[in-house]
Amino acid sequence: MEEHPRAWIISVGNELLIGRTINTNAAWLGSRLTLLGFEVERVVTVPDRVEDIAEEVGRALGRARVVITTGGLGPTYDDVTLQGVAMALGRGLKLHPGALEMVRRFYSKRGLGLTEDRVKMAMLPDGAEPLENPVGAAPGAVVEARGSLVASLPGVPSEMEAMFEKALRPLLEEIAPPGAVVECGIAVVGVPESSLAPYIKEASRVSPRVYVKSHPQGSEIGKPLVRVRVLARASTLEEARAEALKALEKVRRGVEELGGSISEEDSC
Amino acid sequence: MEEHPRAWIISVGNELLIGRTINTNAAWLGSRLTLLGFEVERVVTVPDRVEDIAEEVGRALGRARVVITTGGLGPTYDDVTLQGVAMALGRGLKLHPGALEMVRRFYSKRGLGLTEDRVKMAMLPDGAEPLENPVGAAPGAVVEARGSLVASLPGVPSEMEAMFEKALRPLLEEIAPPGAVVECGIAVVGVPESSLAPYIKEASRVSPRVYVKSHPQGSEIGKPLVRVRVLARASTLEEARAEALKALEKVRRGVEELGGSISEEDSC
């Protein structure tokens, strides 16, 4: 597959590591970033520890065009994501007047004042700008450094999604590569994945801009169900669709030759 | 929290990065590893590329006592996890007679023979031993190197879970630390997370063996719902329970003082 600007997602939170929470945020972001034309290269989940966050953000800097962190922006003692980002950037945290105004407004509308724990949410890495939180109290933050756009979003899914759509998407669209991405696929029944393997390989060679992947979901033998997904990138939507269909055609031929059938189609 | 042997989970698969599949395997494994007494330090999702897999397995070696990879063991062209593990170990892949016998048996029971793509599933890193797959065709692999136990499990959840329980758990129990881990919590209504923050901090100071975390799930203001979870480790189950309850007691007191109430309890 051609080189596309890379994106890293860094998910912060012990609850993810101990399996209390399933990381749906990473999948949601991965899908949006892919359709915007970025190549998601890593999702890294780290504990709520400054050094661990700094280590992974530091690895991503200069390597990924976009680095998105989720979680750890709230008012409690272990919300330390922006400390970790600041450490990776070699900068300090600074009270941002615009962010403080966002926090102040959020609480004053509800008849509450500022407390130490609430003011903490307006401490951003030096040089970062706040991202408005349309749903909750904690602003996000975005900063450009060493060729990477580093954006920090909340961990609560409704807040993360709203901030991504309203505040971050416009910034990403400016740096997203031109062109189009499509993803589609078929579900194949009656053929073991291992028998389909040579056809999938052939399909993947249709173009370097096409990525073909099989997902076995039934049993390998007995009642095999294999979903074959194709992701194609091209300069126009029509071209991307055409390449995806060309690749799927190779798989269809295999299904036919092997006596299987197609139970579902998901058009490009 | 006290130092416990660390575990890393390395999830292999483009479908996870592009958000087509939600990484439920990592949560499932994270929960089991935590209850076995390991501290899950990273979950890293990587593409189906040998170099990327090798990079992350290489980082984990010597740092994590246990490294578990999921996915990429199947018969298709992009199932390259064991190549990545071998590269990280500085070893080659080798046809393992025991693994080949597992694959041969799986297919012959179903009246099928071996093909090149099927034999590929028995190519393990030099020195690794196969892990039986009670559900599917591809064996797993386990190898001890540089102080780390590296285990590779399939990506299909039913296969991953069965292999973990039957083949890997006994090996992990041998190296797991003695002692017990409990996790429990309460759901608090009527108090914003930012007001509860000082009490949560106080609870987290009850013992270095206790970890307290709040998860806001309602809105910060209006109808706040905050789940507070406590994870406690100790040498016996009774001690772990006692420490968890002591920490929760601090939070309960805060809820009372702030005029909130507890809507759910999940006993230790």
From Swiss-Prot, chains A, B:
Gene3D superfamilies: MoaB/Mog-like domain
InterPro entries, sorted: CinA, CinA_Arc, MoaB/Mog-like_dom_sf, MoaB/Mog_dom
Entry superkingdom: Archaea
Coiled-coil regions listed: none
Family recorded in the similarity comment: Belongs to the CinA family.
Protein name stated in the entry: Protein APE_1980.1
Species, as recorded: Aeropyrum pernix (strain ATCC 700893 / DSM 11879 / JCM 9820 / NBRC 100138 / K1)
